[in-house]
Amino acid sequence: MRTDDLIDALAADAGRGTEPAPPRRLALVAGLGGVAALLLVLGWLQARPDLGQAILGPMFWVKAIYTGLLGLAGYLAVERLSRPGGSGRRGWIIGAVVFGACAVAGIYQAITSPDVQAALKLLHGYSWRSCSPRILVLGLPMLALGLWALRGMAPTRPGLAGFAMGLFSGGVVATLYGLHCPEHTFTFLALWYSLGVLALGLIGGWAGRWLLRW
């Protein structure tokens, strides 16, 4: 049987199924991975001391919405890619639009700063060296769980499915990382948060090529 014929047969079988297995499995991955990340945030990094005050401000929720939407984009992509012949196009479009909007806001914030030093302060914040690596570490447990779950599904684009799972994981854990992170600028968010999420995506894509092959 040719590969295209096999994919078509699997897609037909998947279409006849009545149980939403991928959404249910991905929800379980998000739940377990989110709990693991939350425990790491609270036990290792600890919540920011002014959290009670921070949640009253708009930027705390802007960060959560941004990373949450990145996670949603990754979920939509991996949910489709977990099925034979899926492309994840809707997820990619949402992710690109969300990142683009944040990047534009970050660039505008930087170029309207009074001077170069102020722009660099927006970019570096207080934790630019540690932000992306910490998001990466927080997301590894969820990414590992997600790749394991994908092995029980039927992705026909393993590298892309792994990349989407990495973005899903990164969005979830970056949202929880906001409980610790004191940064509050679009410039910082667009660069360092996004890099942490992207790093998980790249690792997921690399691992998926090997772990999710048929």
Swiss-Prot record:
It is found in: Cell inner membrane. InterPro entries: Anti-sigma-F_NrsF-like, NrsF. It comes from the Bacteria. It comes from Caulobacter vibrioides (strain NA1000 / CB15N) (Caulobacter crescentus). The gene is nrsF. Residues 1-25, 75-90, 156-158, 207-214 are cytoplasmic. Residues 47-53, 112-134, 180-185 are periplasmic. This is Anti-sigma-F factor NrsF. Induction: Slightly induced by potassium dichromate (K(2)Cr(2)O(7)). Induction by Cr is partially dependent on sigF. Probably part of the sigF-nrsF operon. An anti-sigma factor for extracytoplasmic function (ECF) sigma factor sigma-F (SigF), which responds to chromate and cadmium. Overexpression leads to loss of response to dichromate. ECF sigma factors are held in an inactive form by a cognate anti-sigma factor. Disruption phenotype: Cannot be deleted in the presence of an intact sigF gene, a double sigF-nrsF mutant is viable. It is a multi-pass membrane protein. Belongs to the NrsF anti-sigma-F factor family. Keywords: Cell inner membrane, Cell membrane, Membrane, Stress response, Transcription, Transcription regulation, Transmembrane, Transmembrane helix. One of its GO terms (cellular component) is plasma membrane. The chain crosses the membrane at residues 26-46, 54-74, 91-111, 135-155, 159-179, 186-206. Changing residue 181 to S: Up-regulation of all sigF-regulon genes, even in the absence of dichromate stress, increased expression after stress. Greater up-regulation in the absence of stress, some SigF protein mis-localized to the cytoplasm.
